[in-house]
Amino acid sequence: MQEYITLDVRLIHFFQKYWLGMARFGLFVIFFWFGILKVFGLSPAAPLVQKLFEATISFMSFDTFIILFGIFECVIGILFLIKGLERIVLPMLLLHMITTFMPLFMLPEVTWSGFLVPSLEGQYIIKNLVVIACAMGIASQLHPMHRHQHSN
């Protein structure tokens, strides 16, 4: 029994030591990889993005949008790697997540197979709850900003 307790303690310490770096790296991989696929026109998500684009945006071409959106995702990924830039990347992630979840409501014929039965595209979107949870974990490690009082 003592061996299990020792293993348990070691695993917990390992996870406590490395979770934050792994969370940052995982978010980088997801956002940079998926973003760069969009930039080079290789993203399997492009048809879904295009359907949402056609339902919402009309001020630029889709070809331009998908490249810019891919670059935006790459930047999010890179920023998650850099400690100290969390307050910049978290609002960017919020904007991205809002747009990512929109097809669940705006394109139900694509994202749902039936009531509470997501299609493959719907599952792809819903799994972003894990991305949000991971980002919340990173955000929970921030220290509150303090107002500096200046005397005249």
Name what the model sees in each region.
Residues 1-152:
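Membrane-interface extramembranous regions
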